[in-house]
Design a protein with these regions (language model features):
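Flexible catalytic loop/linker elements that gate and position reactive groups at enzyme active sites
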Residues: 2-16, 45, 313-328, 443-495, ...
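Condensing-enzyme catalytic core of the thiolase-fold
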Residues: 2-477
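Short, solvent-exposed alpha-helical surface patches in well-structured domains
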Residues: 58, 356, 542-545, 592, ...
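Alpha-helix boundary recognition
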Residues: 61, 101, 222, 247, ...
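Helix-rich "cap/lid" substructures immediately adjacent to catalytic or cofactor-binding pockets
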Residues: 186-187, 608-652
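Acyltransferase
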Residues: 298-299, 303-309, 592-596, 602, ...
Length: 652
C-alpha cells in the first residue's frame, strides 16, 4: 500500500510540474501576443520643408501653417486647372495644398540604381527608399547590418500617377517604367535594395494606409514572422487628378486650410509626404540597447461595412475600432490622455468622428483629465497615405517633449457636435502634458475613404528602458546627411518630365532631440583626449557634403558631445569607401576640421584629406605594403628592395 501511495505521489508531482510548465508557456504566448512594440527609429518628409521628425515637431510646436500655393515645377497647367466655380468640370476650386520640397530629387547612385532605372521610378518609390534608410540610421543602426535579416517592410501607398499614359514616359526609361510605376513594388523595392527578408507588403486602404501598415507590422512582430519592421506610408501628387477629383466631390476647403472640428470647417487640404518607423519588440530593444522613442501598446483595424455610403464615415464602426485597440492594449479609455484625430476638416466626417470619440474616450474620466483632441492636418494638410504616419510621429515627439501642441484654424468648436456628451476638449492652444503617476498615452486615428478604419495607441517610453540604451551610456546620435550626391542628374520630375536643373535630395538622417551629455559639452573644453570623427560617403563631392552637413548639425546643437558624435559615426552608420577622419581635442577643432573638409582644404585636424580635396582621385590603384614583419620569411621586403631594381624604383 505504501508503495502505491509513493507512486501516486510521484505521478501527481509530475503532473503538477507539467501543468505549471504548460501554464508558463501559455502565459509566455499570451504575453508575446500583447508585448508592446518599440519605435526605435523615425524619418519623414512633409510640407513646410520638413525633412526629419525634429523639424516636424518644430513646425507644430511653433504653430506654423505649411500650406502653400500649387507648385510651379511639376509641369501643371495652373491657369487651366483653377476655376472658382465648383461646378466647372475638369478644374479645381482650391489652389493651395501641402507639398514637399523637391520630390524629383533622388540620389540613385547611392542605392546602386542606374540613371535609366531612376528615370522610370515614381517619386513614391524613391521617397520610400530614402525614408527607410533614414529611419534605420535614426535608430542608431547601420542599415547594412540588417541585410539578410528578418525585417519586414509595410508601406502604405496607392495608385501611382507619375505618368498617366505612355506619352509621358521619360525618354530612356524603357524597360523600367512598368516596375517603377507599380505601387506593389514600393515595399518590394525597399526590401530588395536593403536586403530585407521579412514580409514586404504594400497597403492601400486610402487615407488609413500608413496606420494599417503599422498595425500589420506590429502583428507580424508579435507573431514572430519578423524581428524588426519598417512601417509607414508615402504619397506624392504627380498630377492634378486628386485636386480635380476631390473638387468634384466638394471635399476641398476653398482657402486650402483644414479646419478640423471648427465651426468654420469647409473641407480638407490635399497634401503629400512620407513617414517611416522602425519597429521591434520592446524586449529586443532592451536586449540590444536600442534607444526607444515610444511604444505601441495596441492597435486595431476594422471596416465600415454597409453604411450610409461607400465613402461616408461610420460612427459605430469608429467606436468599435477604438474599443478593439484599447482591448488589444489592455487599457481603459481613461488611461489615454489625447487623440491625434483623423480630423480632415470636412463638415460630414469631423462631427461623426468627434461623436465617436465622445462616446468612447469621453466617458468615465476624472474631472481634471479630459481627453485632448487635435489634428496635424491643420498644419500640413491631409497627407493621404502618409497621414497616419504624420500623426504618429507628431504624438511621439509630443510625448518626448511633454507638450500637446495646438491645432490651427479653430475659432470655435463645430456646432454639429454635442460637446456636452462627454469630456473631450479641443487643443485650441498648446498645453503641458504632465506625466503624473502613469506614462503619457495617446491614440491615433485614420479612417480611409475605402471604409477601412485604424486606431493605434502610443505610450511613453518605460523609465527602465529610457536610460538603458547601451548599458546606461549615452544614446547614439544619428547625424544629419548621408553623404551622398549623384555625380550626374538622373531623376525625372514628379510629373515624369526631366527637370532642367535637378537637385539631388539624398537621404538625410536625423538626430534624437534629447542627447545625453557625456563629456566635453562646453565649447572649446577638452574632451579627455583626441576624439576622431570618421566621415564617409560614396564619392568625393558627397564626402564634402557630408562634412558640411555634420558641421551644421553640431554647430546648431551644442548639447551633442564630441564623444557621442564620434561613437555614432563609427558604430551606427555605414562606412563607405571614401573616408576622412577629423581629430580634435574639443568641439572647435573638430568643427574647423569639418569645415576644411567641406571646402576641400587641408587642415591640421584633418587626416587623409587627399580624396576630399581637389587633388586627383587615386582610388583603384594598386599599393604594395611592406609591414617589415616578412609574411613568408624575415626581411622579405628588404631583400626584394635590395636585389631587384624594379622593386627599388617602384618603392622609391
Amino acid at each position: 500500500m505504501a508503495g502505491n501511495e509513493e507512486k501516486l505521489l510521484d505521478y501527481l508531482k509530475r503532473v503538477t510540474a507539467d501543468l505549471r510548465q504548460t501554464q508558463r508557456r501559455l502565459r509566455d504566448v499570451e504575453s508575446a501576443g500583447h508585448e508592446p512594440v518599440a519605435i526605435v527609429g523615425m524619418s519623414c518628409r512633409f510640407p513646410g520643408g520638413v525633412r526629419s521628425p525634429e523639424e516636424l515637431w518644430e513646425l507644430v510646436a511653433t504653430e506654423r501653417d505649411a500650406v502653400s500655393e500649387l507648385p510651379t515645377d511639376r509641369n501643371w497647367d495652373l491657369d487651366r486647372l483653377f476655376h472658382p466655380d465648383p461646378e466647372h468640370p475638369g478644374t479645381s476650386y482650391a489652389r493651395e495644398g501641402g507639398f514637399i520640397d523637391d520630390p524629383a530629387g533622388f540620389d540613385a547612385a547611392f542605392f546602386g540604381i542606374s540613371p535609366r532605372e531612376a528615370l522610370g521610378m515614381a517619386p513614391q518609390q524613391r521617397l520610400a527608399l530614402e525614408a527607410s534608410w533614414e529611419a534605420i540610421e535614426h535608430a542608431g543602426i547601420d542599415p547594412e547590418s540588417l541585410r539578410g535579416s528578418r525585417t519586414g517592410t509595410f508601406i502604405g501607398c496607392d495608385h501611382l500617377d507619375y505618368c498617366s499614359d505612355a506619352s509621358q514616359v521619360p525618354e530612356g526609361s524603357a524597360g523600367y517604367f512598368t516596375i517603377g510605376n507599380s505601387a506593389s513594388v514600393v515595399s518590394g523595392r525597399v526590401a530588395y535594395t536593403l536586403g530585407l527578408e521579412g514580409a514586404a507588403v504594400t497597403v492601400d486602404t486610402a487615407c488609413s494606409s500608413s496606420l494599417v501598415a503599422m498595425h500589420l507590422a506590429c502583428q507580424a512582430i508579435r507573431q514572430g514572422e519578423c524581428d524588426t519592421a519598417l512601417a509607414g506610408g508615402v504619397a506624392v501628387m504627380s498630377s492634378t487628378a486628386p485636386f480635380i477629383g476631390f473638387s468634384e466631390l466638394r471635399g476641398l476647403a476653398p482657402d486650402g486650410r483644414s479646419k478640423a472640428f471648427s465651426a468654420n470647417s469647409d473641407g480638407m487640404t490635399l497634401a503629400e509626404g512620407v513617414g517611416v518607423l522602425l519597429l521591434e519588440r520592446l524586449s529586443d530593444a532592451r536586449q540590444s540597447g536600442h534607444r526607444v522613442l515610444a511604444v505601441i501598446r495596441g492597435s486595431a483595424v476594422n471596416q465600415d461595412g454597409a453604411s450610409n455610403g461607400l465613402t461616408a464615415p461610420n460612427g459605430p464602426a469608429q467606436q468599435r475600432v477604438i474599443r478593439q485597440a484599447l482591448t488589444n492594449a489592455r487599457l481603459t479609455p481613461s488611461d489615454v490622455d489625447a487623440v491625434e484625430a483623423h480630423g480632415t476638416g470636412t463638415t460630414l466626417g469631423d462631427p461623426i468622428e468627434a461623436q465617436a470619440l465622445l462616446a468612447t474616450y469621453g466617458q468615465d474620466r476624472a474631472e481634471d483629465r479630459p481627453l485632448w483632441l487635435g489634428s496635424i492636418k491643420s498644419n500640413i494638410g491631409h497627407a493621404q497615405m502618409a497621414a497616419g504616419a504624420a500623426g504618429v510621429i507628431k504624438m511621439v515627439m509630443a510625448m518626448r517633449h511633454g507638450v500637446l501642441p495646438a491645432s490651427l484654424h479653430i475659432d470655435a468648436p463645430t456646432p454639429h457636435v454635442d460637446w456636452n456628451a462627454g469630456d473631450v476638449h479641443l487643443l485650441t492652444e498648446a498645453r503641458e502634458w504632465p506625466q503624473g503617476e502613469r506614462p503619457r498615452r495617446a491614440g491615433v486615428s485614420s479612417f480611409g475613404i475605402s471604409g477601412t478604419n485604424a486606431h493605434l495607441i502610443l505610450e511613453q517610453v518605460p523609465e527602465e528602458v529610457a536610460g538603458a540604451a547601451r548599458g546606461g551610456e549615452a544614446e547614439p546620435v544619428a547625424v544629419v546627411g548621408d553623404g551622398t550626391t549623384p555625380e550626374e542628374p538622373v531623376a525625372a520630375a514628379a510629373d515624369g518630365t526631366t527637370p532642367e536643373e535637378p537637385v539631388a535630395a539624398a537621404a538625410d538622417g536625423t538626430t534624437p532631440e534629447e542627447p545625453v551629455a557625456v563629456v566635453g559639452a562646453v565649447e572649446g573644453e577638452p574632451v579627455g583626449g583626441p576624439v576622431p570623427w570618421v566621415v564617409s560617403a560614396r564619392g568625393t563631392e558627397a564626402l564634402r557634403d557630408q562634412a558640411r552637413a555634420l558641421a551644421d548639425r553640431v554647430t546648431a546643437d551644442p548639447e551633442v558631445t564630441p564623444a557621442e558624435v564620434g561613437w555614432s559615426l563609427l558604430r551606427s552608420r555605414t562606412l563607405f569607401d571614401h573616408r576622412a577622419v577629423v581629430i580634435g581635442q574639443n568641439r572647435q577643432e573638430l568643427v574647423a576640421g569639418l569645415e576644411a573638409l567641406a571646402a576641400g582644404e587641408p587642415h591640421p585636424a584633418l587626416v587623409h584629406p587627399a580624396q576630399a580635396t581637389d587633388t586627383p582621385d587615386t582610388s583603384g590603384q594598386t599599393v604594395f605594403l611592406f609591414s617589415g614583419q616578412g609574411s613568408q620569411r624575415p626581411g622579405m621586403g628588404a631583400g626584394l628592395y635590395h636585389r631587384f631594381p624594379a622593386f627599388t624604383e617602384a618603392f622609391d
